[in-house]
Amino acid sequence: MLFTPHLLAGAAIGLVADDWWWIVFLSLLFHLLFDLIPHFDPSYEKSRRYFLWSSLDLLCGWLLVMWLTKGIFTPNVLLGMLASIFPDVFSFLIVTLKLRFLNKWVEFHKKIQTDWSIFWGMAIQIVVVLVIVIWRFMVY
């Protein structure tokens, strides 16, 4: 999945969990669970286009979190956000820095994901984002 759904999930976990161990564990777990949902993901590459895409994605996720946490942005929320994107950042670093001894992680991370076309893959991610936004306003 893109960064935005992961960032929102991590922020939501940071809002409701008090213990930092649980925040990290649940954020990582939800990252992997979200990756099981069929989605669109650009492939890791050292290119201007990928950097721009990822930067805009991070910015959108950050801005959505700022909007959703209005005044209750805490270190726990930040920790949840960082932990939730760690698997993707780690995979990107392994691929781009050619850290071949860590390729098993990248293989595992790719294996659990089902890539769909940009249209359907983005539609699924928009639904995930909307569910988290609705949860924020209806439940928490």
Located regions from the model:
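N-terminal membrane-targeting hydrophobic helices
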Residues: 1-140
